[in-house]
Structures are given as structure tokens and as C-alpha cells.
Amino acid sequence: MSKKLTTAAGCPVAHNQNVQTAGKRGPQLLQDVWFLEKLAHFDREVIPERRMHAKGSGAYGTFTVTHDITKYTKAKLFSEIGKQTELFARFTTVAGERGAADAERDIRGFALKFYTEEGNWDLVGNNTPVFFLRDPLKFPDLNHAVKRDPRTNMRSAKNNWDFWTSLPEALHQVTIVMSDRGIPATYRHMHGFGSHTFSFINSDNERFWVKFHFKSQQGIKNLSDAEAAQVIGQDRESHQRDLLESIDNQDFPKWTLKVQIMPEADAATVPYNPFDLTKVWPHKDYPLIEVGEFELNRNPQNFFAEVEQSAFNPANVVPGISFSPDKMLQGRLFAYGDAQRYRLGVNHQHIPVNAPRCPVHSYHRDGAMRVDGNFGSTLGYEPNNEGQWAEQPDFAEPALNLDGAAAHWDHREDEDYFSQPGDLFRLMTAEQQAILFDNTARNLNGVPKEIQLRHLRHCYKADPAYGEGIGKLLDIDVSEFN
């Protein structure tokens, strides 16, 4: 017997083929409440899309510890070799809307939610170790530059390059995006990075600075612009389809988690700002340390409920993992939760995909869509005479030594914009450099020459061969930008 249709209130629906009218050809009646409910719900099915990372795919999996790092962190998910923790992953493009093609040249989001016994840990990263910006005040400007032009409502290469080249610190990220790794072939064939500098705190209350790396066990595969155009012409959901089908076919993708560890005191002595999101830490100084691996092995049963409504927030950390003075990270600690309260509501943490797997004791009350019992008759204030849900000073972090006057400090005092992009360029093979030249020149085509020259000057400062290679393809003589 087939399941029977009801209203949202559970009442039987007698007619779902024809509206109720006054006579065979008469007007529709207002008392046709099923029609009213059905259309009213339809009118409200679409929630606000994410301002960035709107197009994405997700899956559940398991993280397993393979190496001991307890001397660096007291986080229980790393407490013993073999320990497993459930997680949810969401991979995305960044600039495009929900209907954008997967195989666009763009950064990829790489967000993980670990459902630990101490609460949810959200690691909200990308497939690149750096970013365009150092200062979160410019993040809305980046968004506006890569989104649609306010006059034409089209994506604008001019706007992209005008903004990127006005921020010389963006060259490191631009170099990666324009390289052969700018279009991953699938989500399975890309690395992930926490990108920011975070901190570990161990059982002795010692702090270490840490960067997270996720190495794809499937290897790296990328698409050229021509290959991507062909893929997009056939399937705009190519990455989503690949991830979904690989898990359905039990070809479970895996990534190895590695970390770079910096003693807290080193931050004051290294010749660069270790909290600068436009720079990486040299591996020769801070080598990768293997921690574990995660496997994605279960697809969501409902995309909207589990992927679209998933919410990742870098402010969600557990004891033993914390933040750093990274300005971009500090800005995201507010922005992500605030965006989720707008997009999903103040109680979005009760949506099953976002809900912790451990007990929650909070004084947060009421709000739209509060459907979990609202903590019943438990007192809603603290301190209280019953000692309910008191603070936990045992989990206080060690003090972080800070100094300096409060001011709008200009990060441009550090003018080392070009050494690391130059190092990256020189690590490339001749073939990879040629691909970088070709991709960059193609994307700069049609952009005003003034903007082209600005980018060429930056590339030339990173390495003369970098600027010359692109300039040759744009038919611009080196004398115009050296």
C-alpha cells in the first residue's frame, strides 16, 4: 500500500490534482487550504545562499589517529592511536553561486566538522595554503570584486584583476589559482589546508602554533582550461557527481592529516610573520608531522537537510585546539557565525548535521525554530543557587603575551610580497611555468593594459622570468614593466 498524502499538520489530503472552484469554470475558492499551504510553502523553499562557497558537495566519514601528537595537544580526538571520530566534509567552489559549474578556475573550500566527545571542531579551510588577503577589513571588497558586476550582472575579469593587482600581497594566491592546480579534476584529487595558523595546547598548558595539511591519497589531478570547458559543457555538477558516485560505489576517498608545529616562542624570532595568511611556513624549518587520516564513506540522504543546511564556523574549537593572532582568522571568528544566524537562524546548531554528538548545556534560550525542548525548566541564568551549568575554569587557556598600542596598524609595513611567490615559481617545472604563463595571459586578455602592467610588475619582482613569460604572451615588452 502506498503512503498517504497529508497536510503539514498530518490531516489527509483528498485532492492533489485539481484546485477547488465555484462551478466547473468558476473562480478558485479561498477555502482550498491545501492549495494555500502547498503554494505558501513553495514560495519559501529557497533560503539565502552563502555569500561565498555557495556551490558545494558534502559527505560523512571517519577520522582515525595513526600517530601520537599528545605532547602537542590535549584534544581528546587525538588522544590515542586508532581512535576514530565521525566527521562531515563539505567541498566547494568559492566565487560562484549555487548554480555555478564545478569545474571553474577558482579556489576550492575544504571544510570539516569533527563530532568529538568534547564538542564540534570545525576546520574551515581551502585547497590552498594561503589567501589573497592579510586583513579581514578587505574581505567584503574581495567578495564584490569576484562576484557579479553591479551594472552588467556578469562576472568581470577587469574587476577581479583590478582588485587583485591593487593588493600585491595577493600574488601568492593568484599564482596558485593561475597554475596547473587552479582547476582540480575532482574534489577527491586535491589537497586541503587549514590555511590559517591555529594553536595546540597540551596537558601541561603549553602552547604551540600549528598549521593543518590534508594530503589526498588519490593523488593530484587537474584540468586545463580547455578540458574544463569540455567538462562544463557536458556536466555542470562534475565534482559533485564524482564524489557521490565514488562513495556509492564504495571507492572511498581518503586524506592524510599532517601538521606543522612551531614552538610558541619562535613566532617572535622567525624572519616573517607566522600569522600572515599570504605566507607559508618553510617545510625545512617546520616539517610535516603525520597525525592520521580521514575517509569519506557515507553520502547524505537529503542534500538540503544535510549539505545546504550544514554550517561550519572556525570559532568552534575543542580543548587543546585554539586560535592565533592571525587577523584573517580573527575576522572569521565573527563573520561565519553571524552569516549562519542570518542564513539558517539563531538555532542553526540544532539542525542534525550541525548538532554536537555530546551533551550540550547552555543558557541560550528561545529564538525562531527552537524545537529541542529549550532546556525545559532548567534555570536560564548563572550564577544560580543550584550551581547548575557552572563555568569550567579547568579548561582555561594559557595567557597569550601581547603588547603594543591599540591602533589601525598598517600591515603594508611588511613589503615582502614577492619572495614566496618567487620561490613557488622556481619550484615549478618548465612545463608548469608555461601553463602558468598561458593561464594568466588568457585570463588577463581584454583587461585594461594598465591593470595588465600592474600584474606584470608584481610577477617580475617575484622572478623576472615570471613577468617576462606572461608579458610575451600579452605582446608587452619587458621594458614596460621592469
UniProtKB/Swiss-Prot annotation:
- Active-site residues per Swiss-Prot or TrEMBL entry: H53, N126
Q: Name one GO molecular function term.
A: catalase activity
Tell me the InterPro entries matching this sequence: Catalase, Catalase_3, Catalase_AS, Catalase_clade1/3, Catalase_core, Catalase_haem_BS, Catalase_immune_responsive, Catalase_sf
Q: Which SUPFAM superfamilies match?
A: Heme-dependent catalase-like
E.C. number, please? 1.11.1.6
Question: Gene name, please?
Answer: katA
Family matches, as Pfam families: Catalase (PF00199), Catalase-rel (PF06628)
List the induction conditions: By hydrogen peroxide.
Biological processes annotated in GO: hydrogen peroxide catabolic process; response to hydrogen peroxide
Q: Which PROSITE patterns match?
A: CATALASE_1, CATALASE_2, CATALASE_3
Tell me where in or outside the cell this protein is found.
Answer: Periplasm
Q: Which domain of life is it from?
A: Bacteria
Additional observations: Either KatA or KatC is absolutely required for the protection of the nitrogen fixation process.
Could you tell me what reaction this enzyme catalyses?
2 H2O2 = O2 + 2 H2O
Q: Which PANTHER family match?
A: CATALASE
- Its GO CC terms? cytoplasm; periplasmic space
Cofactor(s) this protein requires: heme
Tell me what organism the protein belongs to: Aliivibrio fischeri (strain ATCC 700601 / ES114) (Vibrio fischeri)
Primary localisation category: periplasm
Q: Does the keyword Protein biosynthesis apply?
A: no
Residues the entry annotates as binding heme = Y336
Q: What's the protein called, per UniProt?
A: Catalase
Keywords on this record? Heme, Hydrogen peroxide, Iron, Metal-binding, Oxidoreductase, Periplasm, Peroxidase
